[in-house]
Amino acid sequence: MMKYRRKKKPKVCKLCQSKIDYVDYKDVKLLREFLTEKEKIIPRRVTGNCAKHQRMVKIAIKRARQMALLPYVKY
């Protein structure tokens, strides 16, 4: 029996849709959307971010962690 693959809908970058040019490390509410329950960064293929915004999110999360706005890990 062959299993049929379901066509996946292409994901759209949330940040491009809302026309955000810069991701600020102080915007903790936005950054938490891109973290798992254990505070790990969610990959681009899951979130649907474009490469440019994924890099900005990654850098902003790392800066926020250094400034103690976000935790490194949660157990």
Swiss-Prot record:
Keywords: Ribonucleoprotein, Ribosomal protein, RNA-binding, rRNA-binding. GO terms for molecular function: small ribosomal subunit rRNA binding; structural constituent of ribosome. InterPro entries: Ribosomal_bS18, Ribosomal_bS18_sf. GO terms for cellular component: cytosolic small ribosomal subunit. It comes from the Bacteria. GO terms for biological process: translation. Belongs to the bacterial ribosomal protein bS18 family. Part of the 30S ribosomal subunit. Forms a tight heterodimer with protein bS6. Binds as a heterodimer with protein bS6 to the central domain of the 16S rRNA, where it helps stabilize the platform of the 30S subunit. This is Small ribosomal subunit protein bS18. It comes from Thermosipho melanesiensis (strain DSM 12029 / CIP 104789 / BI429).
